[in-house]
Amino acid sequence: PLRRQRQMCIRDRTNLVLANMKGFSNGPFLDKDRIEQAGNDNVSALKIKTPSLNEVVGQLSGGNQQKVVIGKWVNTDADIFIFDEPTRGIDVGAKIEVYRVMNDLVKAGKCVIMVSSELPEILAMSDHVVVMRGGRVMADIDRDTPHFNSEDIMKAAWGGELD
């Protein structure tokens, strides 16, 4: 997300389960053991580099902060995940981990929608591209069509018609 700093308001391991608090509560109380287990699982699965689960998220690198935000949502039972500029401002290693998480979600039968301004990323990660301009759909392109290329996607983004 573009505003990952704002989305990390909780300072400890609770942050990793924030989007699914019902799944980690026992009546009105949080199940700290389950939260800790989920935190350990996320740190391991997402390869989050942190000295402890209680580390202030803002002290982590940008890539690790991004993985915490993603981990929060992976803990939900959602079928659709929207990634808005998921790799902006993070290093190559963290990008690879984010891509892996997205691919794992797809393999698990989840729908992943990625919004990105990085065209190579879109071409590498997408099976289907919808190009929008000014709130209007300019093109709807499947990977197996001849229009699934940088030139045609940019043409549509600038308002041009595809043949």
Show which residues each predicted segment covers:
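Conserved beta-strand-loop-alpha-helix hinge in the C-terminal portion
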Residues: S25-N26, R136-L162
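Amphipathic alpha-helical interaction/coupling elements
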Residues: Q5, N15, A38, D152-A157
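Short alpha-helical
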Residues: P1, P120, F148
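A short, hydrophobic secondary-structure junction motif
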Residues: N40, L162-D163
